[in-house]
């Protein structure tokens, strides 16, 4: 069974109060659907980084996020994360201001998981940067990580089959 690393944006969207913003509402629906329809098809893991991020902010929202993460195994910290982060940042694949996002990529890659699930398309699932991120990970001897959004697992809404 393949392993999926759950990044913070997934639990944030899946547990948030329904948004009146249509784009955000779609992301919330996709995150909830992935957790209810797809989660059981994979070994799901997360990291201390995600738990720390999920614990921040509004106490009630944090409680909901942490409850969703409660039964998900947490990866052991890897001392090589900072080395991979530095490569992602120094090659301008992820900006310095988004080092935490680079840490999610590094953590998932070093753990050897098959998928990193995120809705952060600015810094993590950025289509223009992903080929270069994958090339770097391959150069570092960390091939095989695929970074996807829930929509890519769920399929399109216009599928008739």
Annotate the PLM regions:
Residues 64-67, 73-77, 149:
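Extended, non-globular alpha-helical segments
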Residues 17-21, 25-28, 109-161:
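Acidic, PIN/NYN-like endoribonuclease modules and their adjacent C-terminal/linker elements
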Residues 10-12, 50-52, 122-124, 153-154:
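Short, solvent-exposed loop/turn segments at secondary-structure junctions
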Residues 50-53, 81-83:
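Short, catalytically relevant binding-site loops at active-site mouths
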Residues 71-132, 154:
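Active-site neighborhoods of divalent-metal-dependent phosphate/nucleic-acid chemistry enzymes
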Residues 43, 73, 144-146:
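Conserved beta-strand segments of alpha/beta enzyme cores
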Residues 48, 78, 151:
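Residues at the C-termini of beta-strands that transition into short coil/loop
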Residues 1-46, 55-64, 90-96, 130-133, ...:
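Short, well-structured N-terminal submotif of metal-dependent ribonuclease cores
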């Amino acid at each position: 069974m393949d392993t999926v690393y759950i990044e913070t944006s997934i639990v944030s969207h899946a547990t948030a109060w329904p948004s009146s913003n249509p784009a955000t509402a779609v992301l919330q629906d996709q995150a909830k659907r992935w957790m209810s329809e797809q989660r059981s098809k994979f070994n799901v893991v997360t990291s201390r980084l995600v738990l720390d991020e999920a614990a921040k902010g509004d106490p009630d929202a944090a409680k909901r996020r942490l409850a969703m993460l409660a039964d998900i195994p947490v990866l052991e910290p890897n001392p090589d994360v900072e080395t991979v982060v530095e490569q992602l940042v120094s090659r301008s694949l992820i900006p310095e201001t988004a080092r935490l996002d680079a840490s999610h990529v590094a953590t998932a890659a070093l753990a050897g998981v098959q998928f990193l699930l995120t809705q952060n398309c600015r810094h993590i699932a950025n289509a223009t940067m992903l080929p270069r991120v994958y090339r770097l990970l391959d150069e570092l001897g960390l091939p095989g990580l695929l970074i996807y959004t829930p929509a890519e697992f769920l399929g399109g809404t216009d599928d008739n089959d």
